[in-house]
Amino acid sequence: VSSAASDVYERQGVALASCSDESSLPIQPEISAEPETPKDEPAPEKDYQQLPVLHVEGRYLKNEKGETVNLHGFTQTYSPFFNDNAWTNYDMQSCLSYNKRMVDGIVAAGWKFNFVRMHLDPYWSDDTSKPFVRYEGHERFSETRFRKYLDELFVPMAEYFVSKGMYVVMRPPGVCPNEAPYQGIEVGDSYQQFLLNVWDIVSQHPKVKNNMDIMFELANEPVNIKGTDGAYGSTSDACFANAKIYFQSIVDKIRNHCRNIIWVPGLGYQSQYAGYATHRIEGDNIGFAVHCYPGWYGSDAEKDSGEGIGSSTGGGYEPFQRGWDTQVGPVAAIAPIMVTEIDWAPLKYDATWGKSITGEAGGKGFGANFKYIADNAGNVSWLFFTTRSHELAAFKDVPGTEGNYTFLNDPEACPWAMYHWFKEYAEGVTVNGEPERLELMGEQATRSLQMGGVHY
């Protein structure tokens, strides 16, 4: 979630070598020639892959049969605050037990999830003896703690998700710097070095390396970057020139070790991507990780979410589609998209970061219009961004009654809508594609309409 939301919602190994003058080394005695003993071949890497292998092909995520795959999931993070205070005091076994129990409950409740966005929560990797600088900042990162809990907590949780049929998208600890003492990120800054270190460690882990069940989202919500012109921003060509350099170096670091699918973030809290169409991230198995909240992209919102990139106004479907086409469309035309944060619910519930309604596709509201845009794009995976696994586990597929709705059963809130939409996706009911024909009965004059990014 955005750094503005962080108060409420979730928001380097070195090998040493010594050198000396060879002339100072003692002369070794000659050894009579003997047949060389064949060297043992290195043991092949164990294959931890369990789910159908996915890869990026053009603008699509595909399986080995060449079929397009769009994933639908949810999120988990691992700190007492976001785990309903069900455990405390770095009790790792209780953390594992609680979160596995939540996964079991979510599956039993009938949710049709096939991926999870897993936060490698800084609760575990922070060195709390260091001074606090910012919420979920990288400044207190301990490589020793990170390696320990990657082994003992995060990888075991990833394996558990995979055993339940879910791919895992790992997100690095914390959020990108933006507020004081920072203005944003900058090529060569300490945050880039932090990300390089994190992904160097993760991409070499024996149970993660080349395990295509596990993917990587490179960073959470970059806001502004220092451009080649020296100015901080999120939309200019100069900013995207440096965004390409910034994230390409991390992609290259990962590719030194493995081929796992990578999801690259944009700028502007992961809402701005157009510049990547010119300054392309190079390599295979690369898509883009997008965030989408009510009020962003010109969409409808009951209340502005406060990042400064949206509003509480909106005109229903058409402005939303135009905003999506402008800000995300240029990369959706060349690579798959994964929306790794999205939610909505009426303001009265105060239960989600985004305040809006499901509404109707083509009309007012946020949720149904987003689904329509994603379905017509044909290459958008997305999820329910939640820090409340216990609510998903408690979900009952029993309709509420008007006047007595709750957050979980109100059709205008995202849980009810997503629960049923994701079941439809899993059953193959929803067909992605553009409309084939549109008739306006009784119309003689020419009309210009926009649907799914296409003008008619």
Outline where the language-model segments fall.
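N-terminal structural segment of carbohydrate-active enzymes
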Residues: 43-136
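Aromatic-lined substrate-binding rim segments of carbohydrate-active enzymes
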Residues: 95-176, 194-195, 251-258, 354, ...
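A mature extracytoplasmic/lumenal domain signature
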Residues: 75, 120-122, 172-174, 220, ...
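Short aromatic/hydrophobic helix-turn
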Residues: 176-177, 223
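Extracellular glycoside hydrolase catalytic/binding regions
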Residues: 51-54, 78, 82-95, 183-215, ...
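Bacterial Sec-dependent N-terminal signal peptides
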Residues: 13-44
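Single conserved hydrophobic/aromatic residue that forms the stacking wall/gate
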Residues: 1-12
